Every structure is written in structure tokens, then in C-alpha cells.
């Protein structure tokens, strides 16, 4: 007699288990806020008067204060060129609501300005020209305006179309090219 074969019962189909939820992406580390309490102001009296005058031009309410979202514009009006990221860090990484609703007075603004002025990583005219020279395919001192618009809207601190239009106004020649040395002089004077 042949040995008995074990008749295996068919296994019931396995229930598909839902895949575990992916772990939430870790929040990017926030840059530490700048401690403004230890900043030593190094301005002359004439500079302080000029800075106060420019600061007060941005006061829309009449309380001698400006909104956080105006700080970068004031600094640029005073000849500085901080990135939005730098200003956000100086302001203590505020929320979008804080950028609109929080206000700072002139005495609170001065240490912020001093931090930007003391920043050793400022780009120079030559740095900007060298960066744009990469796009000068013909080596004639010009770049295509359309290409420059794409660069401004997609690389680094992306600019809005309205900001690009304002910056590019009157910069393109009849062929749609921009003399980048003149363009850099223009943007550094704005």
C-alpha cells in the first residue's frame, strides 16, 4: 500500500494589509535666529539721520514703526542687498502672519541693519557680472533677455513676474539682449 499523502488544505488567500503610512518628512532645521542684543552699532550721526528718514518713509500707519515684511525693502533702499532668508533669520524666523502683522521701531531696526552691513558674504559688482557672464554665449557682453527672465524666476531667490518686469524695464535692446554689466549697475542702484 502506498504511503498516504498529506492532503494539504488550500490556504485561504492572505488579506492585503495596507502599506504603512510613510513617515512624515522631517522639518528642515530652522536657522537659528540672530541675537541682536549684543550688536554694537557703528553709525555716525549723519548716517543715523539718513537711516531714520528712509525708515520713516516706509511707515504706513504713522506710529513710527514698520511691518516685518518691509525690513528687507528698507535695507535695500539703504544700499544693502540682504537675501530674504537672511532677513527672516535676523527677524527670528517669523511666521507669514508675523511678517505682515508684527512691527518694529527704528531703534529695533538699527541692530538688524548693522548685522547686514557687517555680513562678510556680500556679493560685489564683479561677482554678479561673473555670474551673468556664464550666460553670454557669444562673448559680446550681452545675454538674452528671455534667458535672464527664466534665470531670475527659477534660480536662487525666485522673483515674481511683476518683479522681473520692473527690473528688466528698459534693459533689453532691439534684439532682446541685455548688456549684463549695465544691468548689474542698474540693479545695484535700485
From Swiss-Prot:
InterPro entries assigned:
CALM/Myosin/TropC-like, EF-hand-dom_pair, EF_hand_dom
- Main role? Non-regulatory myosin light chain required for proper formation and/or maintenance of myofibers, and thus appropriate muscle function.
Q: Name one GO molecular function term.
A: calcium ion binding
GO CC terms: contractile muscle fiber; myosin II complex
As recorded in Swiss-Prot or TrEMBL, the protein's gene is named: myl1
Classification from the root reads: Eukaryota, Metazoa, Chordata, Craniata, Vertebrata
The identity of this protein, by name, is: Myosin, light chain 1, alkali; skeletal, fast
Q: How does it assemble?
A: Myosin is a hexamer of 2 heavy chains and 4 light chains. Does not bind calcium.
**Which biological process annotations from GO are given for this protein?**
skeletal muscle tissue development
Question: Where does the entry say this protein is expressed, by tissue?
Answer: Expressed in fast muscle fibers during skeletal muscle differentiation.
The UniProt entry, under CDD domains, shows: EFh
Query: Without the gene, what phenotype results?
Result: Morphant embryos have curved bodies, bent tails and a marked reduction in touch-evoked escape response. Muscle structure is altered and myofibers are sparse and disordered.
Q: Where is the composition biased (Pro residues)?
A: 19-28
Amino acid at each position: 500500500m502506498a504511503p498516504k499523502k498529506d492532503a494539504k488544505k488550500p490556504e485561504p488567500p492572505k488579506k492585503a494589509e495596507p502599506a504603512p503610512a510613510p513617515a512624515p518628512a522631517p522639518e528642515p532645521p530652522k536657522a537659528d535666529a540672530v541675537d541682536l542684543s549684543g550688536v554694537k552699532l557703528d553709525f555716525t550721526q549723519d548716517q543715523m539721520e539718513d537711516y531714520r528718514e528712509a525708515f520713516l518713509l516706509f511707515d504706513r500707519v504713522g506710529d513710527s514703526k514698520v511691518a516685518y515684511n518691509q525690513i528687507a525693502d528698507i535695507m535695500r533702499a539703504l544700499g544693502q542687498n540682504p537675501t530674504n532668508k537672511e532677513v527672516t533669520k535676523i527677524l527670528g524666523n517669523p511666521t507669514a502672519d508675523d511678517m505682515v502683522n508684527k512691527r518694529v521701531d527704528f531703534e529695533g531696526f538699527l541692530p538688524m541693519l548693522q548685522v547686514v552691513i557687517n555680513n562678510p558674504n556680500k556679493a560685489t559688482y564683479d561677482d554678479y557680472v561673473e555670474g551673468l557672464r556664464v550666460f553670454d554665449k557669444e562673448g559680446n557682453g550681452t545675454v538674452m533677455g528671455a534667458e535672464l527672465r527664466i534665470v531670475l524666476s527659477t534660480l536662487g531667490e525666485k522673483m515674481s513676474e511683476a518683479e522681473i518686469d520692473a527690473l528688466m524695464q528698459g534693459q533689453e535692446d532691439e534684439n532682446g539682449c541685455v548688456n549684463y554689466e549695465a544691468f548689474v549697475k542698474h540693479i545695484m542702484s535700485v
